[in-house]
Regions:
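N-terminal cap/lid subdomain of alpha/beta-hydrolase-fold enzymes
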Residues: 55, 59-130
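Conserved acidic catalytic loop of the alpha/beta-hydrolase fold
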Residues: 134-140, 147-167
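Conserved hydrolase catalytic core segment
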Residues: 164-204
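Alpha/beta-hydrolase-fold enzymes
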Residues: 194-311
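Short beta-strand/loop motif that positions the catalytic acidic residue
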Residues: 349, 355-357
């Protein structure tokens, strides 16, 4: 399924259900772009029929130069804003940022967000059916890199008729994608906005990813990557998500939200009981305890229930093999090594850049974001850096923040572009 370059995937606001705000993009329909030719991944493996699922918000203008590409993080997808149906419980993952009158104003910009190749939300990935076998690709899916994500999304933009990107925007893995987009397609990219990200995956982040991968791969349900749809290493994937989710928070935010509050019993907390009703039999091991155990290893603390709930909900929307592929792509991201130095990596960049770090982010700490901005400045690029004070951790870029919204709006709408002399780090 494809669309015309000027397609508007939102319904008119007058036809949206009553619970939607006037600044929502409304009801949106995901679209599919099937690449007309085989896509060759960085490591040389070709794939026929690579599909990218995406959404657009707003309308492409006549000059086709006001597009904003939104790049999602590890567990994100193409559904960045709006609602798929009137009964949806939640809007897109960045709905607070994208819409008419919002920081990324869909009255001014044509906004695109695509699920990356290797994902599991409609784009071709390990869980997709291999037409040659009629079975999921599993580990026969080509090795994946951030560069593959960038090149595939550029083909989508070409298909949509985008002549020039006004801005490429992303946080976390999306920030890596945005950086590489500005490097690989300098004449196409006017502005770069990367948040809560890094120029190279460090040892600690790789270590967290490896623990998650081992949780998946040691689950008997993984079966070397061959498992049926809605099956597989569900316990392992839940544990991987529980562990990773901790890295997205901060000590202060967790202490404020949970502290050492305990759970006396499920009966005393109906809401909690509903959250922990693990209907999947495979997940019963998360709550299991031998009857004769001298110590109590059942749920005691609210933070435990929160993490188990995170694991439970994640396995219902994400594929374990996609988790393996995408985290490995993150591990291999290293601009310094790939280009010889960060200055050499950023040498082709023509875009004006805004890099944003968050003080409590311990997954990609502010100093890693600052290093990106400093390298861009050393390479002679128009660059600004902002460090926002927050105790919400790595996920700060996804959460409500008027300070962040004002920063993004100002960067997107500023004219003319700044010069390197306008900013100090």
């Amino acid at each position: 399924m494809t669309d015309e370059p000027t397609a508007h995937s939102s319904t008119p606001l007058s036809s949206t259900p009553g619970h939607l705000a006037p600044d929502d993009v409304g009801l949106v329909t995901p679209l599919d772009f099937v690449l007309p030719r085989p896509f060759t991944f960085k490591h040389g493996q070709p794939l026929d029929g690579l599909t990218l699922r995406y959404e657009t918000y707003g309308t492409l203008n006549a000059t086709r130069d006001h597009a904003v590409l939104i790049c999602h993080a590890l567990s994100g997808n193409h559904h960045a804003a709006g609602w798929h149906s009137p009964t949806d419980k939640k809007p897109g993952w960045w709905n607070n940022l994208i819409g008419p009158g919002k920081a990324v104003d869909t009255r001014r910009f044509f906004v695109i967000c695509a699920n990356v190749p290797g994902g599991c939300s409609g784009s071709t990935g390990p869980s997709s059916t291999n037409p040659a076998t009629g079975e999921p690709y599993g580990l026969r899916f080509p090795a994946l890199t951030i560069l593959d994500m960038v090149r595939a999304q550029k083909l989508l933009l070409d298909h949509l008729g985008v002549a020039e990107l006004h801005t490429v925007v992303g946080g976390s893995m999306g920030g890596m994608t945005a950086l590489l987009f500005a490097i690989e397609f300098p004449n196409f990219t006017r502005r770069l906005l990367a948040m809560a990200t890094t120029a190279r995956e460090g040892a600690q982040a790789i270590a967290f990813n490896e623990v998650g991968r081992q949780a998946i791969m040691q689950d008997p349900g993984w079966n070397n990557g061959d498992y049926p749809p809605n099956g597989g290493p569900r316990v392992g994937l839940a544990i991987a998500r529980m562990m990773a989710h901790i890295t997205y928070l901060s000590d202060a935010s967790m202490d404020r939200k949970f502290g050492r509050r305990t759970i006396q019993s499920r009966e005393k907390s109906p809401q909690l009981s509903a959250e922990l009703a693990l209907s999947d039999p495979q997940l019963s091991t998360l709550n299991a305890q031998p009857a004769a155990a001298a110590a109590d290893f059942n749920l005691q603390f609210e933070v435990e229930s929160y993490l188990r709930h995170q694991g439970q909900t994640f396995i219902n929307r994400f594929d374990a093999n996609s988790y393996l592929y995408i985290t490995r792509a993150l591990d291999q991201f290293d601009l310094d090594h790939a280009y010889g130095s960060l200055e050499q990596a950023f040498a082709p960049v023509l875009a004006e850049s805004l890099i944003v770090g968050f003080t409590s982010d311990w997954l990609f700490p502010p100093e890693q974001n600052r290093q990106i901005a400093q390298a861009l400045l050393r390479a002679g690029k128009r660059t600004s850096y902002a460090e926002l004070s927050t105790d919400l951790g790595h996920d700060s870029f996804l959460l409500e923040s008027e300070e962040l919204y004002a920063l993004i709006r100002g960067f997107l709408e500023r004219t003319p572009p700044a010069t390197t002399a306008d900013f100090a780090i």
